[in-house]
């Protein structure tokens, strides 16, 4: 695995870490003195219904907040709609206290009843298939927490057992407006499913989308742009009592091609750009002349990795989704360990990421409080092709006279790697993986 450093070009000189990427609008409390920002996304939103979203390219970080949020710089939990929370000594109960006088974007009060509705009627509803439903289940019995209203500002979650991720993962989910969505949850469509599932699609008029975040949707033009305007009822103010956000409008341009992202930025049509490894040198040379600044935002939380298809199921005709011969290789722990030793991550860092990156040996990001470092005992797989070959032969694999790897039945070990074709750095990673694996047969 390898990770790149998050490099972002900012065109407006007064920017700092205000908005380094479209997915991190929670950093919008920096004192920015501009009224409009132009950003880019590679894909249209697929829905305006938070609970039904499955796409990484969504409008929701702009328009919704949960009880708590994660600080985009130091990754610590901070109050959001809840001004505070208290965990019981036995860690089985968490009590949240909402901020006073919260409002939705239509001016109606946001209350504990909205929190109750969001979790009990939507997220815990077995008839509503949310992407994150399973992450809300706790313990061996996979049960949801119970939820209880204590008073007009306090709500209590009772967990079946201590569950540390609850605060960071579950309490950060968006709170939804009961007054706008309750009827759709309680009524069914012609197929017997809650109408909520098809409510607030991208064809919904923006004024009907009720939100609680810093922005609300002003307009959406498919394949072109989403325009956000500030939510006048957003709860947050600066130290002088001035309403946030400072930026009153965001134009989110929908441009699939990353090459066009670069062209639009260089022509001045975009205010921000996530810098790709292959374009870093070009932009760094243009930095002074172009009157923009490249900020090093630190390590990304995402990782690049190779994964094997371990699906042993079959289709309706009884044909296995994965060739049983290859499946046998993939399920062999020694085979996977040998692959890990065979990949030269340092070369990836130098050649593909131009030296701007760090090696990552865990699926858990270094910024996470749950990260285990190599110094703390995490097993690592440093580049060692000789060891990779040794592991393979000890596991029953063999080499022919041409040094080609064969399995125990004498079959040549070959498989395909699928990679996202729109991402040049990923293609380069896949090419190097191919070269490294050829080196062990």
Segments from the language model and where they lie:
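Extracytoplasmic/periplasmic ligand-capture domains
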Residues: 22-29, 72-73, 99-129, 143-147, ...
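Short, low-complexity disordered leader/linker segments with a strong preference
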Residues: 1-35, 146, 401, 405
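Hydrophobic residues in beta-strands and at strand termini
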Residues: 41, 81, 87, 97-98, ...
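Residue-level recognition of beta-strand termini and adjacent short loop/turns
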Residues: 88-89, 151, 222
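A structural "hinge/loop" feature
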Residues: 41-58, 81, 108, 131, ...
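N-terminal lobe/hinge region of extracytoplasmic solute-binding protein
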Residues: 40-89, 120, 127, 210
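Surface-exposed binding/hinge segments that line
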Residues: 134-192
